[in-house]
């Protein structure tokens, strides 16, 4: 969807850009596909803070998205393209010919009235989902499973796409949006095409209050806190950290790697992503 700017009537409007929502065809969601979504504000089931800078924001309902696409050989008509407050991509409402309804991620180019289908015999066209073993090398994919039948976990955000680079034995090699080359099982399912809402990356929040509407709280540097609030805090005026950078709880921070060295999925990574 294109983005539009504003005349600088106020400092907050000067840099702000918003989506025009031209692709959205329906403004009210399908009630049968909604679920309650309680605000967690970054807390776990013990009430302890586990993710900083979250809280507030507008109330939301969760849209139940079909990430498995396992309703094989039943054609579905795209009834509408809708906004989803829980993700950067838009979603498409499908009406299956047997009466079932479902939401999927809306790929770029998907139109209302178009027919999509999933299954091993599906055609190679945008919106169809099928096992990777039945997809030609070089095809752009999104909504990709990491384990057969588990549901899609890779390439789900706006504008994302992976390219199928090779198929050898039981595994296929994909080039992910990060540049990482990764192997996945050829029985894993993927959807043809690129995730829609390509202009999402060009949206400028413009002002602090708009971040608060989205449930994002301010990020305060430890160096400007008091020593009882953060290990970097304290001192007269500005001071160097004086130690290796750490989180408020003393764990390594600011560039420290957090991925487990013995992560079981390491063996499926052919080439790590490059530095930005």
From Swiss-Prot:
Pfam families: Ribosomal_L2, Ribosomal_L2_C. Disulfide bonds: none annotated. GO terms for molecular function: rRNA binding; structural constituent of ribosome; transferase activity. Residues 225-276 are annotated as: Disordered. Residues 257-276 have a biased composition (Basic residues). InterPro entries: NA-bd_OB-fold, Rib_uL2_dom2, Ribosomal_uL2, Ribosomal_uL2_bac/org-type, Ribosomal_uL2_C, Ribosomal_uL2_CS, Ribosomal_uL2_dom3, Ribosomal_uL2_RNA-bd_dom. Keywords: Ribonucleoprotein, Ribosomal protein, RNA-binding, rRNA-binding. It comes from the Bacteria. GO terms for biological process: cytoplasmic translation. GO terms for cellular component: large ribosomal subunit. The keyword Membrane does not apply. Part of the 50S ribosomal subunit. Forms a bridge to the 30S subunit in the 70S ribosome. Belongs to the universal ribosomal protein uL2 family. NCBIfam families: rplB_bact (TIGR01171). One of the primary rRNA binding proteins. Required for association of the 30S and 50S subunits to form the 70S ribosome, for tRNA binding and peptide bond formation. It has been suggested to have peptidyltransferase activity; this is somewhat controversial. Makes several contacts with the 16S rRNA in the 70S ribosome. This is Large ribosomal subunit protein uL2. It comes from Desulfitobacterium hafniense (strain DSM 10664 / DCB-2). The gene is rplB.
